[in-house]
């Protein structure tokens, strides 16, 4: 992990470990390259759809509520700094 990258704080996940690690890496890349939450989410969604097939949903922000249905084995919720990341596959 580079000096700019922050350690993600995992809150909930049912992802395989290697997929979780890759999502953490991609999320740190997104935070380093984009400042607008929508741009971070867009980058992650496109990368995940390409890597793991459609259809991924990505929510990034400082304050939101959620109640979602997801495919088993394809859900993660974590923080990087003050940003929360809710990422799941459905559909």
Curated annotation (Swiss-Prot):
This entry's Gene Ontology molecular function terms read:
dynein intermediate chain binding; plus-end-directed microtubule motor activity
Asked whether the keyword Repressor is assigned, the reply is: no
| Cellular location(s) | Cytoplasm, Cytoskeleton; Nucleus, Nuclear pore complex
Annotated Gene Ontology cellular component terms: cytoplasmic dynein complex; cytoplasmic microtubule; meiotic spindle pole body; nuclear periphery; nuclear pore; peroxisomal importomer complex
Q: What is its main location?
A: cytoplasm
What Pfam families does the annotation carry? Dynein_light
- SMART domains from the xrefs? Dynein_light
Q: Keywords in UniProt for this one?
A: Cytoplasm, Cytoskeleton, Dynein, Microtubule, Motor protein, mRNA transport, Nuclear pore complex, Nucleus, Protein transport, Translocation, Transport
Query: Into which family does the record put it?
Result: Belongs to the dynein light chain family.
- Relate the protein's function as given in its record: Acts as one of several non-catalytic accessory components of the cytoplasmic dynein complex that are thought to be involved in linking dynein to cargos and to adapter proteins that regulate dynein function. Cytoplasmic dynein 1 acts as a motor for the intracellular retrograde motility of vesicles and organelles along microtubules. May play a role in changing or maintaining the spatial distribution of cytoskeletal structures. Also a component of the nuclear pore complex.
Binding partners and assembly = Homodimer. Cytoplasmic dynein consists of two catalytic heavy chains (HCs) and a number of non-catalytic subunits which present intermediate chains (ICs), light intermediate chains (LICs) and light chains (LCs). Component of the nuclear pore complex (NPC). NPC constitutes the exclusive means of nucleocytoplasmic transport. NPCs allow the passive diffusion of ions and small molecules and the active, nuclear transport receptor-mediated bidirectional transport of macromolecules such as proteins, RNAs, ribonucleoparticles (RNPs), and ribosomal subunits across the nuclear envelope.
Protein name according to UniProt: Dynein light chain 1, cytoplasmic
> Can you name the source organism?
Debaryomyces hansenii (strain ATCC 36239 / CBS 767 / BCRC 21394 / JCM 1990 / NBRC 0083 / IGC 2968) (Yeast)
């Amino acid at each position: 992990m580079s000096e700019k990258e922050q350690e993600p704080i995992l809150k909930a996940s049912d992802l395989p470990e290697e997929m979780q690690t890759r999502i953490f890496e991609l999320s740190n890349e997104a935070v380093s390259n984009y400042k607008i939450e929508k741009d971070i989410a867009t980058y992650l969604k496109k990368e995940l759809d390409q890597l793991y097939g459609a259809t991924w949903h990505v929510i990034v922000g400082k304050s939101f509520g959620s109640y979602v249905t997801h495919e088993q084995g394809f859900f993660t919720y974590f923080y990087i700094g003050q940003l929360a990341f809710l990422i799941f596959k459905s559909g």
